[in-house]
Amino acid sequence: MRCVPVFVILLLLIASTPSVDARPNPKDDVPLASFHEDANGILQMLWKKGRSCCPSPTSCCPWGKRK
């Protein structure tokens, strides 16, 4: 029962704090779309390299081996 007043006070303090962004957005911030495009490009490059070196996925690729 001693924890209830503390819990109520904490809730009141949390509710009364102003909502402020933790990190302001700088003008030179890179949008996430460019990171997504870069990731897709890298994955496509790795996929093409993996398929060209391993004609049969079960022969030489470690990620293609099946148990």
UniProtKB/Swiss-Prot annotation:
The cysteine framework is V (CC-CC). Expressed by the venom duct. Its main location: secreted. Residues 23-51 form a propeptide. The keyword Disulfide bond applies. Residues 1-22 form the signal peptide. Belongs to the conotoxin T superfamily. This is Conotoxin Pu5.1. The lineage of its organism: Eukaryota, Metazoa, Spiralia, Lophotrochozoa, Mollusca. InterPro entries: T-conotoxin. The modification Tryptophan amide is found at W63. Pfam families: Chi-conotoxin.
